[in-house]
């Protein structure tokens, strides 16, 4: 799957889950599971409930996503 196939959406973290997984509520109201991307993990970027994040989704499974950016 190429980088053009992903869907980027904005959302808000509503809950921390084990193994660097988070429950994210998107702008359109959908709730999904998001995990931290490798670069964010490598640079020790902390994500807390209430943070605004950018999530990448695949067209195949819209219930899971990758958190790629945390807004300040």
Swiss-Prot record:
Provide a Gene Ontology MF annotation, just one: translation initiation factor activity
Location comes to:
Cytoplasm
What start-end ranges are recorded for coiled-coil regions in this protein? Answer: none
**Record bears the keyword Protein biosynthesis:** yes
Per UniProt, residues of the S1-like domain are 1-72
Chain segments annotated as transmembrane: none
**Keywords, alphabetical:** Cytoplasm, Initiation factor, Protein biosynthesis, RNA-binding, rRNA-binding
| Gene Ontology cellular component annotations, sorted alphabetically | cytosol
PROSITE patterns linked? S1_IF1_TYPE (PS50832)
- Pfam families reported in the protein's UniProt record: eIF-1a
Q: How does it assemble?
A: Component of the 30S ribosomal translation pre-initiation complex which assembles on the 30S ribosome in the order IF-2 and IF-3, IF-1 and N-formylmethionyl-tRNA(fMet); mRNA recruitment can occur at any time during PIC assembly.
The record's annotation in NCBIfam families points to: infA (TIGR00008)
Per the similarity annotation, which family is this?
Answer: Belongs to the IF-1 family.
Q: What does this protein do?
A: One of the essential components for the initiation of protein synthesis. Stabilizes the binding of IF-2 and IF-3 on the 30S subunit to which N-formylmethionyl-tRNA(fMet) subsequently binds. Helps modulate mRNA selection, yielding the 30S pre-initiation complex (PIC). Upon addition of the 50S ribosomal subunit IF-1, IF-2 and IF-3 are released leaving the mature 70S translation initiation complex.
| Name under which the protein is recorded | Translation initiation factor IF-1 1
User: Which organism does this sequence originate in?
Assistant: Thiobacillus denitrificans (strain ATCC 25259 / T1)
């Amino acid at each position: 799957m190429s980088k053009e196939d992903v869907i980027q959406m904005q959302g808000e973290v509503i809950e921390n889950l084990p193994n660097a997984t988070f429950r994210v509520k998107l702008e359109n109201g959908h709730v999904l599971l998001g995990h931290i991307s490798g670069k964010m993990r490598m640079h020790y970027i902390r994500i807390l409930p209430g943070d605004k994040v950018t999530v990448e989704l695949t067209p195949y499974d819209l219930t899971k996503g990758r958190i790629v950016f945390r807004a300040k």
